[in-house]
Amino acid sequence: MHKLKIISIAITVLLLVVFSVYFLQPQKSEIQEIPQSVSAKQAIPDFAEIKQTTEKKKAFFSYLRPEVETQNAHILLQREFVHGLRAKHIAEEQITESQMEELLWLMKEYRVEENDDLDLVFDKLLTRIDIVPVELVLVQTANESAWGTSRFARKGYNFFGLWCFRKGCGFVPKRRNDGAAHEVAKFDDLSTGMYTYLRNLNRHDAYKEMRAIRKQLRDQMKPISATALTEGLTKYSERGDDYVVELKHMIRTNQDLM
């Protein structure tokens, strides 16, 4: 009887621990989660083994397209949330505490400074929280990863040429200049890599021209064109204007394959 009582107490304690972990701990909302695609952690195809150029390109685009669409859908979810809060603000309706927490998280995530003028905050957020055309992502990742054959893509899901600056955060480039401390970022899965890449385009000062072009297209109710947005990516590569010219060429020549 004594043993049964001890077992009963132990089970009760265990249930309380489980309850506290899953129900009392603060949970990330859908807005804050990095969405994980079905293929996020799957092995990366060996694109180098595909000798026929057209087939290699098709395989590359087919592998990455679902991930781009997944992350863009998540960005639109965040954007819809901001639109909803702005509508409440205009209507002078009360923004709830949980909604304000979400708003503050988005401001931090997209590097928008706090301001008493909420209209300004919403405008800045909506300029940053927006999609990047699938075609642009596909050709840029192809360019940066040598069609998925670079070691950074194969071993670290980095199809984007993204750097990191904490020792051990990624791969040390073989051709890194003396005194340089950067590494090429390594990601645990494709979803995290794609999320980080799109967030980088949407919040880094280097790409504010790209965001301005996108906003202008939105304001004019025109489609967000991959070719148009390339004009804002001169700072993505040391090659500057030549890099933009190459991206445009890749968009044009691979249109039928994407």
What are these regions (language model features)?
Residues 2-139, 143-258:
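Catalytic cores of secreted/periplasmic lytic hydrolases that degrade extracellular macromolecules
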